[in-house]
Amino acid sequence: MDDTLYVCTGHSWVEAIDAATGKIKWKYDPKANTGPDVYLACRGLAYYKAPEGASSECPERIIAPVLDARLMALNAKTGKPCEDFGDHGFISLTQYLGHVPDGFHFVTSPPMIISDRVITGGWIFDNQATFEPSGAVRAFDPVTGKIVWAWDVGHNPQTWTPGPNDELTRDTPNAWGVYTADPKLGLVYLPTGNAPPAYFGGHRRPFDDKSSSSIIALDAKTGELRLHFQTVH
């Protein structure tokens, strides 16, 4: 952005680098839990400029995944956490997932920002068990960090806003990779995997089979399904 490169490291550090000189302007360490069951990877981060007057503290922010299933917002100029986002700059992505064993859910891909939404899924540990955490995709307010919608294939309706004590459907297909979007259409495109475990599907439910191995397009603002194309039946 402008004269600054923003990068993330395998340990979830975020650094701002002067694009001309290569000097580090600032770096931030979120003190991520990097235990033995966590992949040390970060595929990217996102930039968001808040509408005028929406945030005096962090008008420009970097929103990045943290290995231990958190999402953080940092001031793009200083690297300090945005206090108005979630809990002092962080939101926990394990909320609404029920019991999550260590290393069973984390995010390595950049969140997608479109239509004033921060949209992210997550990686679910393959081939470990059934009754694993949900693969639902969620959208958050980029200023406050509050959840706006969740796309949960096992829920009726599939798009809903979970409350503090709600749990998203377990064992559903996840979309852990890099998303793409079309701002003109207001759509976000998700590549889905399979419901866990990866290599046996005899127990899978009809909604698992329908949404596995698919390209999904959702209305970024509302989370409503707009397109579903299954690549493998």
Regions found by a protein language model. Give the residues of each.
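Repeat-blade elements of multi-bladed beta-propeller folds
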Residues: 1-11, 38-70, 103-130, 134-136, ...
